[in-house]
């Protein structure tokens, strides 16, 4: 039996971040799946806030629509999970957001977990997410660093030191598992885990392993319920999306 193919899409346009995402994704997939990693060709260099998220999601939809080979699942490689619901309507395969996947794994693997984020991470948003998922009692909180998302492209030791400092604060407050609110925090995670001494979950790895788990349970196209398109209609422009949008993919 052929291995499934997981399409991992970075909604931003950063080549450096996409390369890091690809490394983590392949490591997580192991022998269980093939990985194809792509990035948005149009949109912001990094995603920081709602406007960037919408622009990045639009670019991501174009990338998925233009990909001409078959794939069995899509992983959205941004912790805010932009465009996940739209992609679930566009394609007929499981679509996994790395943010939701990370929360799920943390809930299973720890008693209490926390999130270390770049400066754009908001405690209110993540508190709302954990409440909606029913895991709020396990959530220690959000530890916001002064780092921009683009800083994670750097090999500057000061970046890792800053992440470690905030991770240590979270551990002191009772977290025995840490998430990181950016897919770009990838290559640094093992060092952080060693220095802090608690489990650190790479968000991209969580997304890929969740996709593999979904494929083991569900192979039929996802067409009903929340995946049902209400009315067929023509699509003007967005040529790369037409075959998926009209159900011909």
Name what the model sees in each region.
Residues 16, 107-145, 158, 213-249:
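Short, glycine-/small-residue-rich phosphate/pyrophosphate-handling segment
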Residues 54-70, 160-174:
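Short, well-structured alpha-helical segments in soluble
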Residues 127-183, 188:
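Active-site rim beta-loop-alpha module in soluble metabolic enzymes
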